Amino acid sequence: MTNYDQHHALQSLTLGKPTPYRERYDPSLLQAVPRALNRDLLGLQATALPFHGADIWTLYELSWLNDAGIPQVAIGEIALNATSTNLIESKSFKLYLNSLNQTSFPSREAVRVRLAEDLSRCADGEVQVVLRALSDFTSSPLLDFDGECIDDQPIHIDDYTFTNRYLEGAAGGSVVSETLVSHLLKSNCLITHQPDWGSVQIRYRGARIDREALLRYLVSFRQHNEFHEQCVERIFCDVMQFCRPETLTVYARYTRRGGLDINPWRSNTHFSPATGRLARQ
């Protein structure tokens, strides 16, 4: 369990509270969560992070009015750099996007620029924004993570309390380069404790990681309360600490909530994430 869910930085969040919807553009709806809350517990310093990466958001419910008052729609893709001071709280992001619904913009590019400015200000870091037409997705198939799925092992699990000790001694033997995948990642929102469902891809070069130990570790997140981004950084740090791979990439894609999905990745090597939807997205 985390020990910062009552931190003063979280007390003003709209998450978990009844909140009215604004009908006009209002960037003040965006709320930031300091990344330092969980990074301090992991022993990470902003000036010497052991990884690079991004939080990739997909915005499925994005609409505004053009100058003629006709509603416009697009699908947004947001990449929030992992070096930003803050992550963006998802409910506030949804409320902010809804505030665009009855607001006029002269062009899609004007919307993109406004999103980039507002999100960068909230996150205190680099944010890339792409807005795509719905027609761009008509021929886009569902994807699956590359790699070996470790979910169908003949093991018994009866403890769902989070612990990274499952990874102690989990790596050994010859050096391999491989990619392991699990679709059984489930954690809970830090504030509301609502379930967050995800698939995770772990790509590494190093001593071979025991599949059973890794699966038990991932399943132990099942009753753990943290935001998506924080879980991915915890997985990265735990695998690095106990398995000591030469290179490591952790990439998770979570199911959507409120018209948004969040897909964080962290890596200490070159990595270009595939951004297509998985089956549950």
Curated annotation (Swiss-Prot):
The GO terms describing molecular function are: preQ1 synthase activity
| Gene Ontology BP, a term | tRNA modification
Q: Which Pfam families would you find in this protein's record?
A: QueF (PF14489), QueF_N (PF14819)
Active site residues per record: 189, 196
Sites where the protein binds NADPH: 90-91, 257-258
Question: Catalytic activity, per the record?
Answer: 7-aminomethyl-7-carbaguanine + 2 NADP(+) = 7-cyano-7-deazaguanine + 2 NADPH + 3 H(+)
| Metabolic or biological pathway, per its Swiss-Prot or TrEMBL entry | tRNA modification; tRNA-queuosine biosynthesis
Ligand binding (substrate): 88-90, 228-229
- Report the transmembrane regions from the record: none
Identify the EC number(s). Answer: 1.7.1.13
Enzyme type, top EC level: oxidoreductase
Chief subcellular site?
cytoplasm
- Quick one: a GO cellular component term? cytoplasm
User: What does the UniProt keyword field contain?
Assistant: Cytoplasm, NADP, Oxidoreductase, Queuosine biosynthesis
Per UniProt, subcellular location reads as:
Cytoplasm
Q: How does it assemble?
A: Homodimer.
Q: Which PANTHER family does the UniProt record give?
A: NADPH-DEPENDENT 7-CYANO-7-DEAZAGUANINE REDUCTASE
Q: Say what the protein does.
A: Catalyzes the NADPH-dependent reduction of 7-cyano-7-deazaguanine (preQ0) to 7-aminomethyl-7-deazaguanine (preQ1).
HAMAP family given for it?
A: QueF_type2
Q: Which family does it belong to?
A: Belongs to the GTP cyclohydrolase I family. QueF type 2 subfamily.
UniProt-recorded name of the protein: NADPH-dependent 7-cyano-7-deazaguanine reductase
Designated gene of the protein: queF
